[in-house]
Amino acid sequence: WTEANRPKLDWQTKIFYSGSACMYPEYNQTDPDNPDCREESAYPAAPDSEYGWEKLFSERLYLAYNRNHGIPVRIARYHNIFGPEGTWDGGREKAPAAICRKVAAVPPSGGSIEVWGDGLQTRSFLYIDECIEATRRLMESDFKGPVNIGSEEMVSINELVDTAAKVSH
């Protein structure tokens, strides 16, 4: 995006930014009994990684562009989207794919898998079709400001492992 493009835009132009729940403060993401990831809970800012900081800073840049130039901006904060064609391995996969891959590798006679942390961490998971529908609705709306796109249901990593194990063998 450059200022040179600005004169070419018409009144229907909107800018979309794909954010992430990783921009929420680490303390909001680690308490399984109180996973506070409401849009307004982003501050005071304290993401747990450079990726989270990049997502937060980028949101601020797009919102500043909106304020300064009047072009509508829509920001989606995605939460663990999964579905077909998602990355399955290699370290970039989401938790559902990583857990399913690990569970599928356990022989029917039994075994264990590595779970980072204590497994009590909770996450919001959303199927890709629901994600696409939510994104479409966001783009068609007049809503201003970042919007979470994820499920309201929080699932612990241990629950995800148990579910994957039940359906795999």
Model regions: which residues?
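Active-site Tyr-X1-5-Lys
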Residues: 3-5, 26, 46-79, 98-109
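Glycine-rich "substrate-gating" loop/helix at the edge of Rossmann-like oxidoreductase active sites
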Residues: 47-51, 79-93, 117-129, 151-155
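Conserved short acidic donor-positioning loop in nucleotide-sugar-dependent glycosyltransferases
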Residues: 21, 99, 152
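Active-site loop of short-chain dehydrogenase/reductase
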Residues: 6-15, 70-72, 110-112, 118, ...
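C-terminal substrate-binding subdomain of Rossmann-fold SDR/epimerase-dehydratase oxidoreductases
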Residues: 105-169
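Proline-centered turn/helix-capping motifs that create local helix->coil transitions or kinks
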Residues: 16, 22-32, 70, 104-111, ...
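Short glycine-/acidic-enriched loop or helix-start segments at secondary-structure transitions
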Residues: 26-28, 85, 158-160
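Conserved Rossmann-fold NAD(P)-dependent oxidoreductase catalytic core, especially the SDR/UDP-sugar
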Residues: 1-49, 74
